[in-house]
Amino acid sequence: IRDRVTMEYRKEDLMEAKKQILGVGENMGTEESKKIWEENAQFWDNAMGDKSNEFHREVVRPKVTELLSPNPADYILDIACGNGNYSSYLAQRGASIVAFDYSKKMIELAKRRQSQYAKQIEFCVADATDRKSILELKRNRAFTKAVSNMAIMDITDIEPLLMAVYELLQESGIFVFATQHPCFVTLTE
């Protein structure tokens, strides 16, 4: 029971942070959004930990992984990587990853948390709403795959992201993303 109470408390904290992040409204600009994520980065890192939350572990991660089918030959772009826990999951499967987030603080936390995978994961700060920023992640080879877990719905303008992913992926590359279904959105107004 104690674990359940702790989990419920954490869910309340998570909901409060999410409300703060999402509660600004649809007209929230990238800089305003970035500021809120910077302020909440440590909370999210603590809440997601090394293995993410239960919903992600039990529902999202298995399906995304099934669709992505990571293997040691893969060179994967992890979009809006947060604290890097999915990047490390991919690294454990032998893949090489370039992971980015627009929160500098979140990337610092990811580098610290996932330091044992430093040879396989390159963490970068980049803005998913800025095509040029994303294209700067291009290295000496094209990505075999791209992935985004539960982030697309929080990106204010996805067209630059989609254009950049298209350019960065090899011709046979795939882009797998998970997003929140509208029926799970909490109405705040």
Regions found by a protein language model. Give the residues of each.
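N-terminal amphipathic/basic-hydrophobic helices that include classical n-h-c signal peptides
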Residues: 1-24
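Conserved class I S-adenosyl-L-methionine
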Residues: 18-71, 85, 89, 109, 174-189, ...
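Class I SAM-dependent methyltransferase SAM/SAH-binding core
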Residues: 75-79, 83-133
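A short acidic, Gly/Pro-enriched loop at the edge of an enzyme's catalytic core
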Residues: 134-146
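A short SAM/SAH-binding and catalytic strip from SAM-dependent methyltransferases
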Residues: 144-158
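A short glycine-rich, Lys/Arg-flanked "PGG" loop and its adjoining helix->strand segment in the class I
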Residues: 159-174
